[in-house]
Design a protein with these regions (language model features):
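C-terminal structured subdomain/cap of oxidoreductase catalytic cores
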Residues: 123-134, 138
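C-terminal cap/loop subdomain of S1 sulfatases and analogous C-terminal strand-loop tails that border
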Residues: 1-11, 28-32, 36-114, 129, ...
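Short beta-strand-to-turn element immediately C-terminal to the catalytic PLP-Schiff-base lysine
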Residues: 21-23
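Catalytic cores of eukaryotic secretory-pathway lumenal/extracellular enzymes that build
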Residues: 17-18
Length: 152
């Protein structure tokens, strides 16, 4: 656990990784750390489950409420990010990541658990398996320039 100063507006963990504090006395155990990767679509089902509300359906989100309770739950294997913090001055990036690895659309792979600032791309033949797995996940997601939504 390192302190990272600066980096907002960058695709490294310094700009995209945000800590989440969950507080529900008597329900969510104190001093618990959950390493699950979640994305924004997971918040609505999580809040619904935590409050006993009916979840929206259909949804891409997964509740991470069980993990907050210290249970296994149904954690995501990875998350997909389409990142363009400054559309007027930066080119969009696509990447997929899990708790340890991150693969960009340009095929750069990083071991983010050990290289938080992404200084050393992983190129070793030993990374072939994880690269293939993450590439398969990335291939399922919209590519740059695709229309993501239609309003008919």
């Amino acid at each position: 656990d390192k302190v990272i100063v600066g980096g907002k507006g960058r695709p490294t963990d310094a700009g995209t990784h945000v800590a989440l504090i969950a507080y529900q006395p008597g329900t969510v155990p104190a001093d618990q750390i959950c390493k699950s990767v979640v994305d924004f679509s997971d918040f609505a089902p999580t809040i619904a489950e935590a409050t006993g509300a009916q979840p929206l359906s259909p949804t891409d989100g997964r509740s991470f409420f069980p993990q907050l309770l210290g249970r296994k739950g149904n954690p995501r294997e990875n998350i997909f990010i389409y990142y363009c913090p400054k559309p007027e001055t930066s080119k969009p990036l696509r990447f997929v990541r899990n708790e340890r690895w991150k693969l960009y659309g340009n095929n750069r792979l990083f071991d983010v658990a050990n290289d938080v600032l992404e200084k050393k791309p992983v190129t070793s033949p030993a990374s072939k398996g994880i690269r293939k797995q993450l590439q398969a996940a990335l291939d399922q997601m919209p590519s740059e320039g695709q229309k993501l939504m239609t309003f008919d």
